Regions:
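A polyanion-binding, active-site-adjacent surface
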Residues: 1-122
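Short active-site oxyanion
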Residues: 3-4, 53-56, 202-207, 383-385, ...
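Conserved RNase H-like, two-metal-ion catalytic cores of nucleic-acid enzymes
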Residues: 4-6, 13, 18-27, 122-255, ...
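Short glycine-rich phosphate-binding loop at a beta-alpha junction
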Residues: 56-60, 206-213, 387, 511
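Alpha-helix capping/helix-boundary segments
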Residues: 63-65, 214-215, 393
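Metal-dependent phosphoesterase core characteristic of DEDDh/y 3'-5' exonuclease domains
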Residues: 69-98, 105, 109, 176-178, ...
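Conserved "right-hand" nucleotidyltransferase catalytic core of DNA-directed polymerases
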Residues: 118-186, 244, 255-257, 269-494, ...
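Conserved catalytic alpha/beta cores of large enzymes that bind or transform nucleotide phosphates
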Residues: 498-520, 533-544
């Protein structure tokens, strides 16, 4: 029988032997021996355990997982083997206030028991299933094998130096055609024959991506490839689960394939490289990763995408879901790929003028604030200049010195809030909050939009950012990346006024007012409500 340890955060009343159905014996440990500590920090941990004497170590909750592995998300890894012997699991105590996690617990428990009893065969990732190709002849032979294979589809992925085609280039492509092995091919191995073979492959086979919008953009921009038929495992999963944040290839591979966190060795290498060279995480360049380090991770991307497609494509047996996928999500993906490539046209000169005008307005607003006698008096009493960006000073000025009545809204630490909503209400009592709010609003427009847009414009004065089909539970589009185009200021036209239509074109603003009610009236077959929309009437006044 395997020797097992179980580690929880601190002493609790949870009977873990009962929770695991008495399926195995274990030694129980706590990170912190003091049950009175509310939030256990690293300095509170006094655990004394020799991990080498155990075959398996069950880590209960996120604290234990992070302590031993530096991984934060226990839900993502629950029931999966991490490194050589760690088995993370969510804390069963959470089921009392989060009953929807019951399935996660049950599945994780069954998986852990099988690991400990030796009923799960260890999966080894080596060159037999994930390999690299740097030789041109070997590259072309592998692509020819994919063409000759009798399967209808292939899985395709790319490794790039940037998030946008104009900001980076392709380091290599990953390809899987049989669901048994994946290859990572360096673009340095490409020749004219390679490109001809790939063009033919993409024309004859269904190409399966995970996040097609990203990969297609690079393939189309840098190689002019086309994809007449493509699928997207990310969007297929979105049909199953609309909740944002859970559609990544890593997360789904951990959950639905036996290969788990296959990318961890590469990220461990990256962490070590950054540490040795004193490089910040945001400054690390993907091109610095050696081919021999990259190849396994990249090849596994294609293999796992293939496996996910085999599992998720069954969803399309549901005709309603298949219709949404085939008629909305896939065409929408194609449309948004083109939209992102087209970009948003800005007038660079007007942006620069607006930037200076806004700075002038900010300077004037600050000058007006400092001319207020309340500010000069406050500075004399405190013996230092007033900083409007300091929430501590602002709180003292508004509530202690001027004596305004707090709104009752508090911060997470229990202090009186000074956010925009609070300042708006306090403006009824004094001019100072109004002046502060004016400075904040103008500074946000300049810092968040004008200053950010200008350096990110491409040479054609267009901003190319992201639009997403899978970012909301409501089915609405979301925007992310270089700039969230859905959050341009409404109350100040200075930013939107810098968007410039191309010659011969116009910018059109359209808003589907009460679209959800419109759809509901049709689905409910409510004739009276439908008549309101047919006649162009006002829904709200009619209901009132």
């Amino acid at each position: 029988m395997a020797k097992v340890a179980l580690v929880e955060t601190k002493p609790s009343r949870t009977d873990f032997r009962r929770e695991f159905d008495g399926a195995f014996e274990f030694d129980q440990y706590q990170l912190c021996s003091d049950p009175g500590i509310k939030k256990v920090l690293k300095r509170d941990c006094d655990i004394d355990i020799d991990t080498n004497i155990y075959d398996w170590i069950v880590l209960v909750g996120s604290d234990a997982l992070k302590y031993f592995t530096k991984i934060n998300s226990v839900t993502e890894y629950s029931g999966k083997k991490v490194e050589e012997k760690f088995l993370p699991v969510i804390n069963p105590a959470m089921l009392k206030f989060k009953p929807e996690a019951r399935k996660t617990w049950d599945d994780s428990k069954d998986s852990i028991i099988k690991y400990i009893k030796g009923e799960i065969e260890e999966v080894i990732i080596d060159d037999s299933i994930a390999f690299g190709i740097e030789d041109t002849d070997e590259c072309n032979n592998f692509i020819q094998q994919a063409l000759d294979h009798d399967g209808d589809y292939i899985a395709l992925d790319s490794e790039t130096t940037g998030l946008y085609p104009r900001d980076g280039y392709m380091l290599g492509i990953s390809l899987c055609y049989d669901g048994k092995r994946g290859a990572y091919i360096s673009t340095e191995a490409f020749d004219e024959t390679t490109e001809e073979l790939l063009a033919k492959l993409f024309k004859e086979k269904i190409v399966v991506f995970h996040n097609a919008k990203f990969d297609m953009a690079f393939f189309e921009y840098h190689f002019n490839f086309t994809f007449p038929r493509f699928e997207d495992t990310m969007l297929l999963h979105y049909l199953i689960d609309e909740n944002p944040g859970g559609h990544g290839l890593k997360q789904l591979s951990i959950k639905f394939t036996p290969y788990g966190d296959y990318e961890k060795p590469m990220y461990d290498w990256m962490d070590q490289y950054r540490k040795e060279h004193g490089i910040l995480k945001g400054d690390f360049q993907w091109s610095w990763i050696p081919f021999d380090i990259m190849k396994t991770y990249a090849a596994m991307d294609a293999l796992c995408t293939f496996m996910l497609y085999e599992k998720f494509v069954k969803i399309k047996q549901n005709k309603k879901l298949a219709w949404v996928y085939d008629n909305i999500l896939i065409p929408g993906c194609r449309f948004l790929t083109d939209t992102q490539d087209n970009g948003v046209p800005f007038n660079r000169k007007r942006l620069e003028i607006s930037q200076q005008l806004m700075q002038d307005d900010i300077d004037k607003a600050i000058a007006t604030l400092y001319e207020n006698p309340k500010i000069s008096e406050f500075e004399k009493i405190n013996g230092k200049d007033f900083n409007p960006n300091s929430t501590v000073q602002l709180r003292s000025l508004l509530f202690d010195y001027i004596g305004l009545n707090p709104t009752g809204k508090k911060t997470g630490t229990g202090a009186h809030s000074t956010d925009a909503e609070v300042l708006e209400r306090l403006s009824e009592q004094s001019e100072v909050p109004k002046l502060i709010l004016d400075i904040r609003q103008k500074s946000k427009i300049k810092n968040t939009y004008l200053d950010k847009i200008i350096p990110q414009l491409d040479r054609d004065s267009r901003l190319r950012t992201g639009f997403n089909l899978h970012g909301t539970t409501s089915g609405r589009l979301s925007s992310s990346g270089k700039l969230n185009m859905q959050q341009l200021p409404r109350d100040n036209p200075i930013v939107k006024g810098c968007i410039k239509a191309a010659e011969g074109h116009r910018i059109v603003a359209m808003d589907l007012t009460t679209a959800d009610v419109y759809v509901a009236s049709i689905l409910a077959k409510d004739e009276a409500l439908m008549d309101v929309f047919r006649s162009g009437g006002n829904f709200h006044s009619t209901i009132a």
